[in-house]
Amino acid sequence: MNYYSTSIAKLIEELSKLPGVGPKTAQRLAFFIINMPLEEVKSLSQAIIDAKEKIKYCRICYNITDTEVCNICSDKERDHSLICVVSHPMDVVAMEKIREYKGVYHVLHGVISPIEGVGPEDIKIKELLDRVKNGNVKEVILATNPDIEGEATAMYIAKLLKPLGIKVTRIAHGVPVGGDLEYTDVVTLSRALEGRREL
């Protein structure tokens, strides 16, 4: 039996599609939204539409941006000879929160996962190799998640980079196996970056 009007039921259904939002949270959010002033609801909807329509990928690092080149890649103060490779744009946010890393990034947009049908050609590995070959890169830090797929991806990339004579390191210490960088606290992530090891 459906206790809601069609429009509320539809809103709850759509909110339930968001990651980490179950039926009860979706219901709570839906009722919060319908009690918001109309102008705030319109502003929220417009912000979602704008983000979806205007966000693109940086042509250098593939992080999300609303310009051709992201703020990090266009920052002359950053060390462009140091590239930190991460799986997802949210990992860049996690790394930036520690305020210690002064290099640039490369976002893979996934990890190698044969079970999910994701191979090296499905993520931005070729683009990383092209960038390293064409740039003045001294070190690549592999900061994929410390789970099976993240480790496999890091080892695969390290194997491809070794012949190029570039220092390849892996973050270590404190990032739990099976954990996500996105949820790792700032101190742990900072120590992991400091304790990176060469591969």
From Swiss-Prot:
**GO MF annotation terms:** DNA binding; zinc ion binding
The record's annotation in Pfam families points to: RecR_C, RecR_HhH, RecR_ZnF, Toprim_4
Question: Which InterPro entries does this entry report, sorted A to Z?
Answer: DNA_Rcmb_RecR (IPR000093), Hlx-hairpin-Hlx_DNA-bd_motif (IPR003583), Rcmb_RecR (IPR023627), Rcmb_RecR_Znf (IPR015967), TOPRIM_dom (IPR006171), TOPRIM_RecR (IPR034137)
- Coiled coil feature spans: none
**GO biological process per UniProt:** DNA recombination; DNA repair
Q: What does this protein do?
A: May play a role in DNA repair. It seems to be involved in an RecBC-independent recombinational process of DNA repair. It may act with RecF and RecO.
Name of the protein in its database record: Recombination protein RecR
Organism, as annotated: Thermoanaerobacter sp. (strain X514)
